[in-house]
């Protein structure tokens, strides 16, 4: 497992609109992945703020990659629940999306995601997730 494997998973496993977000794998370790979501006009709202929809899509995507890094390969899964808290606007900078597997059982996996500004390091969104392992 390496960053290239995880980057390739973005192209192989996700819908074209997710690929259009141009997510980049920055780092990983087993059960943890950090992605960079580049700032773009297509994902921004008034005031160049990153939209909540883009943050949630990036969070969900990062968590699937964290599960891949946990298992060592892709294991089919589906999102059961995602709870998000938007803490502050994220404007005029890339976002770092860090996903961490908290626990994996036989049927369910649990994780948490923190999205922060790449320049200021301030947390803009926190999410918790539950996935069904298929």
Give the predicted meaning of each segment.
Residues 1-134:
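Terminal targeting signals and extreme-terminal segments of soluble enzymes
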């Amino acid at each position: 497992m390496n960053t290239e494997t995880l980057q390739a998973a973005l192209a192989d496993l996700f819908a074209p609109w997710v690929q259009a977000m141009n997510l980049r794998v920055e780092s990983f370790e087993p059960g943890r992945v950090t992605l960079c979501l580049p700032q773009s006009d297509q994902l921004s709202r008034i005031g160049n703020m990153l939209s909540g929809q883009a943050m949630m899509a990036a969070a969900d995507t990062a968590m699937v990659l964290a599960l891949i890094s946990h298992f060592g390969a892709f294991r089919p899964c589906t999102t059961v629940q995602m709870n998000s808290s938007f803490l502050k606007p994220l404007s005029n900078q890339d976002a770092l999306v860090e996903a961490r597997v908290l626990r994996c059982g036989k049927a369910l996996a649990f994780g948490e995601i923190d999205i922060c500004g790449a320049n200021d390091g301030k947390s803009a969104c926190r999410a918790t997730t539950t996935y069904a392992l298929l």
